[in-house]
Design a protein with these regions (language model features):
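Hydrophobic membrane-spanning alpha-helices of multi-pass integral membrane proteins
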Residues: 99, 242, 346-364
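N-terminal amphipathic/basic-hydrophobic helices that include classical n-h-c signal peptides
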Residues: 1-38
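"…together with the soluble PPM/PP2C metallo-phosphatase catalytic core" -> "…together
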Residues: 36-301
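Internal alpha-helical transmembrane segments of multi-pass membrane proteins
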Residues: 144, 207, 339-347
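Structural signal for the N-terminal portions of transmembrane helices
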Residues: 281-292, 360-361, 370-377
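Cytosolic, membrane-interface loops and tails of multi-pass inner-membrane proteins
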Residues: 63-88, 302-343
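Alpha-helical transmembrane segments and their immediate juxtamembrane interface regions
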Residues: 128-140, 366-405
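Juxtamembrane "helix exit" motif at the C-terminal ends of alpha-helical transmembrane segments
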Residues: 103-110, 359-373
Length: 405
């Protein structure tokens, strides 16, 4: 069975194309949604069903919060809390249901077997990450270490199901090491766990993680479509549709939160797609996958460094309120719009980070076959993050009337 799944998931490589990217990006949307009737049918039965299932599940969870609220409600107390109303933090259930329904809705189409194989692998392998995250949402007693190991276990399980692991990153020496299966699997598990936890760490404001995830999935899907990997492109579309259903209830008013279960599941899905894209398509630089994920990765690395080395006595796993999104809310939104409600200020924060996310994602699409271009874009993205963070942390870029605060 593993061999069969691996044949479906990995057994094809998209052809390199000589035409420029400028001539391919715009036709993508036309060919995807208008020009090809079979693709339009897939959109109707897969993505729309995923979005509808996710949205309906969110509505149901919100309407029944009096039944499950004693377990699922996110308290308003805490250093990282930016909401004023008790809110269910189990939106990950809705996203998982949406992806599952999208998977089931594609069963009528024999041509979608490859996409179903990818989705089934994501659903099955993502369960450890999702379950441990959901347990934390419901009990608040699952340690950071246990959740990290669960996300890494999802990466190993993904390899066990599909046989796919990172075998090249275009780095001399490291590529040779990745030729050994054990090293390749462990490296993949570490990368998957890192991205999953990075997605969780940026989950701080209404619409932030969902919006960032939609942008990242769009970039992955667009690259997959450009190199002819239709199955992976539509996998991204189905997952994005499930996220979109949740997004409607999460932004801007925050009727339901993603929770650790949703963040870890989405983080795993993104990480696994990041692994699949260059492994299935030899023409795609692995650095483009890293570039798409660079915002949450930079956030988690900088947070660990800040807590461990810049804040004496602060545990690297303990939460704080000085992430980039936290500073953007306090230094920009609250100063520029002091008379708006807290919930409105909350909803206004995410778009600032969406804009930041779009830049590296656009560069990843543009340079997806160019290692130098992606590496330079990575450096620019990291330097931009540091520059913005320093400006906000040291009370610059504030409205003039509040400069003495």
């Amino acid at each position: 069975m593993r061999a069969a799944v691996r044949t479906i998931v990995v057994g094809r490589f998209a052809l390199n194309r000589s035409n420029t990217i400028h001539g391919r990006i715009s036709p993508f949307f036309i060919s995807l949604f208008l020009a090809n009737p079979s693709m339009l049918e897939l959109l109707r039965y897969d993505a729309l069903m995923a979005a509808a299932a996710s949205l309906c599940t969110c509505i149901l969870l919100v309407l029944t919060k009096s039944w499950h609220g004693s377990f699922s409600i996110d308290s308003t107390d805490g250093i990282q809390k930016f909401h004023t109303q008790p809110t269910p933090r189990i939106g990950g259930i809705a996203i998982a249901v949406g992806v599952l329904v999208g998977f089931a809705a594609s069963s009528h189409d024999p041509a979608a077997a490859e996409k179903r194989a990818i989705l089934s692998a994501i659903l099955l392998a993502g369960m450890p990450a999702f379950i441990f995250g959901l347990l934390e949402d419901l009990t608040k007693r699952v340690s950071v270490r246990a959740r990290l190991l669960a996300t890494m276990a999802s990466g190993i399980l993904g390899w066990g199901i599909t046989g796919v692991a990172l075998t090249h990153v275009n780095v001399p020496g490291l590529d040779w090491l990745l030729g050994f299966t054990a090293i390749s699997v462990l490296f993949t598990a570490f990368a998957v766990g890192g991205v999953a936890n990075a997605i969780n760490i940026i989950d701080g404001f209404n619409g932030l993680t969902a919006g960032v995830t939609l942008i990242m999935l769009g970039a992955f899907g667009l690259i997959a479509r450009l190199v002819g990997d239709i199955a992976l492109a539509f996998t991204c579309l189905v997952i994005a549709a499930a996220v979109a259903g949740f997004f409607v209830m999460n932004w801007p008013r925050g009727k339901i939160f993603l929770g650790d279960g949703g963040a870890y599941f989405l983080g795993f899905a993104l990480a696994w797609i990041a692994v699949l894209l260059p492994e299935r398509n030899a023409s795609v630089s692995p650095w483009s996958s890293l570039l798409i994920c660079i915002y949450p990765i930079t956030e988690i690395i900088f947070s660990i460094y800040r807590r461990r080395y810049l804040r004496e006595g602060h545990n690297a796993t303990e939460p704080d309120a000085i992430h980039l999104h936290s500073l953007a809310n306090r230094r920009w939104i609250k100063k520029l719009f002091p008379n708006t409600s807290i919930i409105t200020q909350n909803g206004m924060t995410a778009p600032l980070l969406w804009i930041y996310t779009i830049l590296p994602c656009w560069a990843a699409v543009y340079f997806h076959q160019n290692r130098i271009g992606t590496v330079l874009s990575l450096l620019v993205s990291i330097l931009l993050y540091i520059a913005i963070y320093r400006k906000l942390a040291f009370f610059r870029w504030l409205p003039r009337k509040n400069n003495n605060e």
